[in-house]
């Protein structure tokens, strides 16, 4: 590359004189001249390059020129001579350009050197050749990709000083533009910095180009830095600059910042264009400041005389839908359409999605149909939204209809949508439809191995074992070989259905196909047999596993220990745990210890549970919430409340929070000790800890107050329970009715019994005994008779329990006519009696009432059924 040092160009002293006085030293010039008849008509097109400026009608050199060839001219005319001629034509840029084209090839000219920079300065001196200077700089940067901006700027400045040219901002700006045109944004940024250092005012369009490139490249900080430098030298930019800064803020997900930029520009009295208004609206929507967005839409119409674009209106509609304001979203859409702007698919999709979220599928469907009527074709997203919401609302006929419409217009559903459809069909008990959709998606290459696994898992989780089997066969027919994961899921489904023979046969089939069982395979089978109380078959699987030299891991041993505890072999489970720790050096998890502790608690052996807890701590295993909950429950059941409280203190010292089951056990324990004050204090702590009491907790408290005859407190709890949305169960009603009848409140007891029947809860033997023993007393009959007459006078229909009590009372006292009359009256009113209660009341066979403490112990379904 030609050096930029001028000392090597000149031949002092005579050539130095020539630069000072460009006249030749003789009447015959020694420099080559272009032909005088050369055309000087030069286009102003900025896209034209310097190469187009070579002589189109080049003739032989003039007679006064030396007889040398062009190649000789290129090789032997040195830069000093060319510069002398150029300086002589400095006031005629077109002539200077023609001379350079003739004497120096373009590729050599763009290598750099003083000739290039002198020509640039000459071209910049005339408005007619500005574009030529700009294009030359673009080519120069392209030919010198490694020349850093600092060197370029120094050459530009140095050449202007040495050859007496005025240095204008245009020269620097054209150099900046050259870097931009060559996509050298790193050098463009450096060049901009050098310009700012020299207090050169940049051309705003060029800076905008730099900002645009940086924003597109997500170099937001660099873009902001350039803008700040721009402002420091007094250049605020134009609307495009503002747009770029706002886009940068939106890319950073800082819409508030974009809004501030817009407001700052408006405060300076700027006149925003449509695009700037649109960006401001988008920023306001993302803030979201929808009041501002609507104000901007109105202001835009007022200042520009035209409504916003479809894209801008769509932004506002989408924002209102996100805020859940469907009414305003529809109003904006109607306004848009009223201005003759067609509804966009994006806006329509957003509105449809909003209607669906608000469970207004009818309106969503109407909008979808309206969109089609207006000639707007639904896209993949629109169809997917409709199908997804129909599936969520279990309207599978509509879902399938839209799914097929989607395919009919050749829009391929995504794998996610296929999965949603299959899941919906399975929930709707339509496994055949699910299989058909899968088969269709497979033919369309939408389904793949991973998706097959997910769909198969859906079948298994929902207990659709037959459909899962058909699916497995379908996969095999299509060449997809099921792996061990498929077989594990199939076995798990059979185990959950208690089909252990089928689970075992699947295991055998897997072995026949040469698939190796893994830890989950054995765990599933072993756990399944233990849960079905089939200890023998569980051990058969364990022995088969050991015989195959399979190395069991902690998962399997945890399963075995947990299973032994479930079948009442807790001591055996503990022995196995100790052997694993001692012989195999296994570090068993907290789960195994918890299973053993819970096993001992269930059989009432709290001492062994505590011993296991201590061993657990000695072996370096920290107890968790489950551990303490099991122990607290055991102590409460064995009426050792002091130890239960001690466990809670230890739990808190380890920074573990009591969970709802632990609180439930403590509350139940104190209720059974008739310590309702402590029980209710614990109950009051639950909301403060973010725990919602369940039906078991309420039942314990209601039972406790009933045992003490405090039915007012029990009624208050019942009302709170209902207000909190906790559904009462059979035990709740049994306890309440028992207490109310003993308290003589037959009216409320009757209402609760009717409520129980209305909810579809079937009374059991215990409730029947409570009713018979409570209603068969002489006092209750008289009270019920009086209540019946009062209700009739008030034209209020008595309930079945009240009728049954009065009829049975008359029957026992021999008033058969009155008994039959009331029976017929009851049937005429459409009241169907409870045969069991009625027969017991009439027969007079009254069982001994269960003790209150006995009834209160039946909180769990297991204990209730065993009574």
From Swiss-Prot:
<keyword id="KW-0809">Transit peptide</keyword>
<dbReference type="Pfam" id="PF12854">
    <property type="entry name" value="PPR_1"/>
</dbReference>
<keyword id="KW-0496">Mitochondrion</keyword>
<dbReference type="Pfam" id="PF13041">
    <property type="entry name" value="PPR_2"/>
</dbReference>
<dbReference type="GO" id="GO:0005739">
    <property type="term" value="C:mitochondrion"/>
</dbReference>
<dbReference type="Pfam" id="PF01535">
    <property type="entry name" value="PPR"/>
</dbReference>
<feature type="transit peptide" description="Mitochondrion">
    <location>
        <begin position="1"/>
        <end position="49"/>
    </location>
</feature>
<feature type="repeat" description="PPR 8">
    <location>
        <begin position="414"/>
        <end position="444"/>
    </location>
</feature>
<comment type="similarity">
    <text>Belongs to the PPR family. P subfamily.</text>
</comment>
<feature type="region of interest" description="Disordered">
    <location>
        <begin position="27"/>
        <end position="74"/>
    </location>
</feature>
<feature type="repeat" description="PPR 1">
    <location>
        <begin position="168"/>
        <end position="202"/>
    </location>
</feature>
<feature type="repeat" description="PPR 10">
    <location>
        <begin position="483"/>
        <end position="517"/>
    </location>
</feature>
<keyword id="KW-0677">Repeat</keyword>
<feature type="compositionally biased region" description="Polar residues">
    <location>
        <begin position="60"/>
        <end position="72"/>
    </location>
</feature>
<protein>
    <recommendedName>
        <fullName>Pentatricopeptide repeat-containing protein At2g39230, mitochondrial</fullName>
    </recommendedName>
</protein>
<feature type="repeat" description="PPR 4">
    <location>
        <begin position="273"/>
        <end position="307"/>
    </location>
</feature>
<comment type="function">
    <text>Involved in lateral organ development and boundary demarcation.</text>
</comment>
<feature type="repeat" description="PPR 19">
    <location>
        <begin position="799"/>
        <end position="833"/>
    </location>
</feature>
<feature type="repeat" description="PPR 3">
    <location>
        <begin position="238"/>
        <end position="272"/>
    </location>
</feature>
<feature type="repeat" description="PPR 2">
    <location>
        <begin position="203"/>
        <end position="237"/>
    </location>
</feature>
<feature type="repeat" description="PPR 17">
    <location>
        <begin position="729"/>
        <end position="763"/>
    </location>
</feature>
<dbReference type="InterPro" id="IPR002885">
    <property type="entry name" value="Pentatricopeptide_rpt"/>
</dbReference>
<dbReference type="InterPro" id="IPR011990">
    <property type="entry name" value="TPR-like_helical_dom_sf"/>
</dbReference>
<feature type="repeat" description="PPR 14">
    <location>
        <begin position="624"/>
        <end position="658"/>
    </location>
</feature>
<feature type="repeat" description="PPR 15">
    <location>
        <begin position="659"/>
        <end position="693"/>
    </location>
</feature>
<feature type="repeat" description="PPR 16">
    <location>
        <begin position="694"/>
        <end position="728"/>
    </location>
</feature>
<feature type="repeat" description="PPR 7">
    <location>
        <begin position="379"/>
        <end position="413"/>
    </location>
</feature>
<feature type="repeat" description="PPR 9">
    <location>
        <begin position="448"/>
        <end position="482"/>
    </location>
</feature>
<feature type="repeat" description="PPR 5">
    <location>
        <begin position="309"/>
        <end position="343"/>
    </location>
</feature>
<feature type="repeat" description="PPR 18">
    <location>
        <begin position="764"/>
        <end position="798"/>
    </location>
</feature>
<feature type="repeat" description="PPR 12">
    <location>
        <begin position="553"/>
        <end position="588"/>
    </location>
</feature>
<feature type="repeat" description="PPR 6">
    <location>
        <begin position="344"/>
        <end position="378"/>
    </location>
</feature>
<feature type="repeat" description="PPR 13">
    <location>
        <begin position="589"/>
        <end position="623"/>
    </location>
</feature>
<feature type="repeat" description="PPR 11">
    <location>
        <begin position="518"/>
        <end position="552"/>
    </location>
</feature>
């Amino acid at each position: 590359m030609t050096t930029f040092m001028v000392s090597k160009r000149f031949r002092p002293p005579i050539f130095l004189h020539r630069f000072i006085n460009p006249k030749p030293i003789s009447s015959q010039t020694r420099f080559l001249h272009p032909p005088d008849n050369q055309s000087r008509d030069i286009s102003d097109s900025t896209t034209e390059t310097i190469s187009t400026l070579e002589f189109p009608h080049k003739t032989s050199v003039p007679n006064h020129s030396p007889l040398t060839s062009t190649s000789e001219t290129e090789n032997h005319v040195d830069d000093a001579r060319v510069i002398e001629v150029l300086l002589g034509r400095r006031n005629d840029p077109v002539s200077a350009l023609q001379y350079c084209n003739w004497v120096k090839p373009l590729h050599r000219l763009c290598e750099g050197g003083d000739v290039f920079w002198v020509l640039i300065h000459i071209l910049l001196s005339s408005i007619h050749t500005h574009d030529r200077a700009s294009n030359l700089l673009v080519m120069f940067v392209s030919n010198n990709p490694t020349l850093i901006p600092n060197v370029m700027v120094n050459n530009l400045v140095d050449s202007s000083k040495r050859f007496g040219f005025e240095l204008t901002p245009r020269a620097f700006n054209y150099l900046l533009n050259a870097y931009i045109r060559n996509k050298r944004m790193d050098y463009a940024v450096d060049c901009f910095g050098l310009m700012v250092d020299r207090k050169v005012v940049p051309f705003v369009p060029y800076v905008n180009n730099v900002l645009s490139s940086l924003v597109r490249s997500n170099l937001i900080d660099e873009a902001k830095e350039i803008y700040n430098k721009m402002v420091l030298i007094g250049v605020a930019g134009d609307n495009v600059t503002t747009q770029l800064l706002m886009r940068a803020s939106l890319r950073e997900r800082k819409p508030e910042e974009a809004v501030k930029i817009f407001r700052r520009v408006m405060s300076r009295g700027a006149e925003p264009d449509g695009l700037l208004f649109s960006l401001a609206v988008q920023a306001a929507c993302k803030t979201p400041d929808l009041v501002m967005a609507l104000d901007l839409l109105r202001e835009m119409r007022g200042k520009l005389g035209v409504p916003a674009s479809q894209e801008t209106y769509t932004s506002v509609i989408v924002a209102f839908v996100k805020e859940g304001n469907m009414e305003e979203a529809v109003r904006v859409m109607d306004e848009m359409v009223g201005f003759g702007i067609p509804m966009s698919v994006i806006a329509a999709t957003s509105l449809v999605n909003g209607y669906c979220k608000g469970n207004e599928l009818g309106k969503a469907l109407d909008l979808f149909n309206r969109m089609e009527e207006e000639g707007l074709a639904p896209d993949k997203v629109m169809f997917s939204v409709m199908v997804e919401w129909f599936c969520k609302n279990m309207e599978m006929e509509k879902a399938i209809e839209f799914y097929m419409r989607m395919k009919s217009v050749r829009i391929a559903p995504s794998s996610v949508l296929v999965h949603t459809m299959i899941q919906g069909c399975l929930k709707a008990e339509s496994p055949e439809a699910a299989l058909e959709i899968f088969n269709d998606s497979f033919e369309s290459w939408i389904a793949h191995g991973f998706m097959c696994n997910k769909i198969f898992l859906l079948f298994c989780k929902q207990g659709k074992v037959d459909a899962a089997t058909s699916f497995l066969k379908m996969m095999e027919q299509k060449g997809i070989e099921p792996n061990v994961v498929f077989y594990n899921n199939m076995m798990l489904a059979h185990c959950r259905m208690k089909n252990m023979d089928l689970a075992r046969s699947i295991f055998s089939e897997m072995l026949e196909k040469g698939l190796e069982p893994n830890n989950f395979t054995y765990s599933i089978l072993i756990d399944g047999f233990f849960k079905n109380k089939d200890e023998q078959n569980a051990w058969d699987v364990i022995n088969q596993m050991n015989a195959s030299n399979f190395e069991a891991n902690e998962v399997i041993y945890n399963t075995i220990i947990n299973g032994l505890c479930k079948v009442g072999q807790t001591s055996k489970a503990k022995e196995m745990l100790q052997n694993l720790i001692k012989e195999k050096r296994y570090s068993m998890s907290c789960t195994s210890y918890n299973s053993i502790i819970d096993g001992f608690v269930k059989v009432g052996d709290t001492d062994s549970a505590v011993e296991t807890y201590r061993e657990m701590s000695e072996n370096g295993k920290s107890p968790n919430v489950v551990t303490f909950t099991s122990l607290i429950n055991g102590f409460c059941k064995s009426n050792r409340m002091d130890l239960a409280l001690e466990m809670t203190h230890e739990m808190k010292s380890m920074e573990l929070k009591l969970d709802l089951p632990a609180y439930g056990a403590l509350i139940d324990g104190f209720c059974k000790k008739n310590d309702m004050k402590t029980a209710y204090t614990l109950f009051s702590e639950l909301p403060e800890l973010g725990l919602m009491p369940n039906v078991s907790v309420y039942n314990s408290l209601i039972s406790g107050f009933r045992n003490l005859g405090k039915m007012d407190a029990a009624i208050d709890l019942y009302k709170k329970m209902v207000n909190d949305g906790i559904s009462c169960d059979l035990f709740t009603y049994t306890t309440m009715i028992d207490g109310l009848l003993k308290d003589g409140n037959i009216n409320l007891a009757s209402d609760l019994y009717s409520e129980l029947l209305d909810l579809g809860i079937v009374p059991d033997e215990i409730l029947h005994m409570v009713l018979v023993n409570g209603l068969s007393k002489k006092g209750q009959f008289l009270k019920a008779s009086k209540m019946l007459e009062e209700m009739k006078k008030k034209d209020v229909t008595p309930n079945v329990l009240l009728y049954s009590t009065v009829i049975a009372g008359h029957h026992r006292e021999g008033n058969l006519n009155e008994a039959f009359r009331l029976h017929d009256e009851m049937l005429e009113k459409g009241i169907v009696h409870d045969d069991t209660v009625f027969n017991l009341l009439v027969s007079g066979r009254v069982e001994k009432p269960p003790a209150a403490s006995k009834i209160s112990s039946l909180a769990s379904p297991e204990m209730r059924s065993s009574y």
